[in-house]
Amino acid sequence: MSAKNSKDRTETFYARTGKRIFDLVLSIPSLIILSPVYLLSAILIKLDTPGPILFSQDRVGQNGKPFRLYKFRTMVKDAAKIGPPVTTADDPRITKTGRLLRKFKVDEMLQVMNIVKGDISVIGPRPEVKKYIDIFAEEYKDILKIKPGMTDYALIAFRNEEDILSRFQNVEEGYIKEVMPEKIKLYRQYLSEMSLRTDIKIFFQTIWEILVK
């Protein structure tokens, strides 16, 4: 992707204004529609293991600005203190309820709140933790020009990321050396194709991957 093409896409009317309208049109009704799912998830988490219902983590947003990303807690309390930020399918820190929520990406659905707040978009490169972005600082210069998103090409391609990481003896090393470079390629692909048509396509592809396949 050329620098010129990237610049053109990030400075279009859709990138500057249209995406925010698209985000609000989808996210505000979603908060109402998903409220029963949120309530049921909260009850199951509370009944399953001790600890908070929600999990939040610092991620890097547009132009490098940090923000708090929200999810339903799917791991044991203080899981971040006893393991790496990335997880595998057989990670013992994942709770019974957590496995169910992760299977259908229900834990991620709470990020609709981040969309309404303006931290992220519906569609865009997935928000990453700073330690990994620092490793790929040069590659992320263009990627951080736009808001991260709830879903994108990379989320679809790595739908079973935890299973992929299970193959590596050193999970974090596998994520950095094998998974991250491929994700960055897909982030750049999105950056070069960003448009309303592309966002609608990715939105429905995500629904197909999670609910149908």
Question: What are the roles of these predicted feature ranges?
Answer:
Residues 4-79, 190-213:
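A hydrophobic, helix-centered structural microdomain
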Residues 7-9, 13-14, 145-213:
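C-terminal terminal-structure detector
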Residues 9, 31, 85-88, 144:
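Residue-level "hotspot" positions that anchor or transmit function at local structural transition points
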Residues 27, 55, 95-99, 131, ...:
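Positions in alpha-helical segments
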Residues 41, 84, 123-125, 130-131, ...:
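Short, hydrophobic secondary-structure boundary micro-motifs
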Residues 55-93, 154-181, 185:
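Short, glycine-rich, amphipathic interfacial segments at transmembrane boundaries or analogous
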Residues 88-154, 201-203:
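A short, structured surface patch at a secondary-structure boundary
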